[in-house]
């Protein structure tokens, strides 16, 4: 493993950004009277603050540098004012004005951090305040607007917020957190550029007071407009259970991380206080705080690796306002901004990249960074499991960037080796391919319920006679022929399936499990592969709906049969249902097998030309249409069981024709006619 060398870096802020944040606001030495900024009962005098904002001579564009310079003394006065208050005084004077954010207790914690004078804690406070403020401002936006902007800078620039708070007030916020031309405190911290000593505490104090001032302005607006502020519900982390692969964090793991972070070249020494605070927050069960710190420092460390392996050391620093920062978006991408291949994915390896994409990027993953940074999660209820997984992953990553002979005893411990092994075997769990595997297995489990549901013997005998009709026999024959064809592409370990006898069965379940445990390459999937996966997942979802409906109908009709509440027509329909179910179960099982096999070979779609790809997608969409119609026909409202059989025969004919022409993806699998599930 190549080791990152040379830790002489004192800041990750570019010269202009460093000057803007660390120096410019200290150049004016005037002393501001705090009474001109805030009244004795805590009301913010906004004009004293907005008058400090400067604009370009022509037009209304902000002069960010001059604004930062002129706001410096105001921030200093606010900081001294906040510092002069006891906790009780601060709570009495300002807590009522934080209620609009739904997290008033957060601002007391920020006060405590300022009192502690711990730089890392103050930086964390700015991160938390920015995300909380963004969420609260989004709620205010929705008083007037319909769709809240995703990015904070777009939210602050919106006409809706300017209408509520005034343009001048919004310009003040832009200087602090809304533009790369200003202090941009939110982004330099959340993206891991700013070290603890880079953030002057007075800016945290200023944001603390400004948020209270916004609460005062909002109260006035709500009073005059007679409207009520509604808060959007917090979101939960999607599919978090899927990405839990490491055991829970133990004291041994925490101790190991504390040791490794002082030896690993992954992190810059100027960032060490953040790592120390992250461990401390985990120990005190502040899991959201821990995760916020780890995310920003994971990005900082990976940016360092990115800059090294791609031979672009300047990318370690914040870019100037005219250039995009190097963030997770580019660090984890296939290509760099100039179009060249990003070397970091190859260097880190697919398992590590899969983990990062699962946690951060995939739409069906927890997307922890987005959720936390935009204030979408209730940080008081942030799950320990999420913090545990990220912390353990960071430990394994830091170990990779230690000298070979360093910490040799620690690396040889069984508990540590287990974590390394789990990380090295990680496979994506939030990519659409894995989610399809989950869906197929879930539906197969549902289908296994059908034969074991209680059924009246008399109705079963009638249904059995109906199953002998010509259409049902034709369907059974087609199923057998298609299965016989698919058998050539099953894993070598699978037993041959003869007709319907193996549908469904214990071996059938084992077969689908084996197919769905096949590792599918997921990183940087091409568009055509994703298009195929969308349709395959649509088919699987509809199959699940059919199964759920059939189970619910069978249970209801059986209960009505036992209770003698079935009318004559319902009884006849029940018999037709039982007859159709005997056919639909193997058909749905066949479709699940087809989905599993096509998924294993999904990358073979590249072997088709453009016309063949479109033909293949039309074939899949035909099956999708069938399953959608089946959902309608098997619903309690329609109960069109005979029509469902006719529909089934038509789709089986199309599947057989397509299969006979060797046009499915399994037919394009090279070198072998068996699926390799190793």
Curated annotation (Swiss-Prot):
Q: What happens when the gene is disrupted?
A: RNAi-mediated knockdown of the protein, performed in utero by electroporation in lateral ventricle of 15 dpc embryos, results in a massive neuronal migration defect and in the development of heterotopic nodules along the walls of the lateral ventricles. At 20 dpc, a significant arrest of cells within the ventricular zone is observed, while, at this stage in control embryos, cells have reached the cortical plate.
* Family annotation (InterPro entries): DUF4209, ERMARD
**Major subcellular site:** endoplasmic reticulum
Q: Where are the bilayer-spanning segments? A: 390-410, 577-597
Query: What are the GO cellular component annotations?
Result: endoplasmic reticulum membrane
Topology of this chain in the membrane = Multi-pass membrane protein
Q: Where in the cell is it found?
A: Endoplasmic reticulum membrane
Transmembrane recorded as keyword: yes
Keywords, sorted A to Z:
Developmental protein, Endoplasmic reticulum, Membrane, Transmembrane, Transmembrane helix
Q: Which Pfam families match?
A: DUF4209
Record bears the keyword Ligase = no
What function does this protein fulfil?
Answer: May play a role in neuronal migration during embryonic development.
Q: What is this protein called?
A: Endoplasmic reticulum membrane-associated RNA degradation protein
Q: Which species does this protein come from?
A: Rattus norvegicus (Rat)
| Gene name in the database record | Ermard
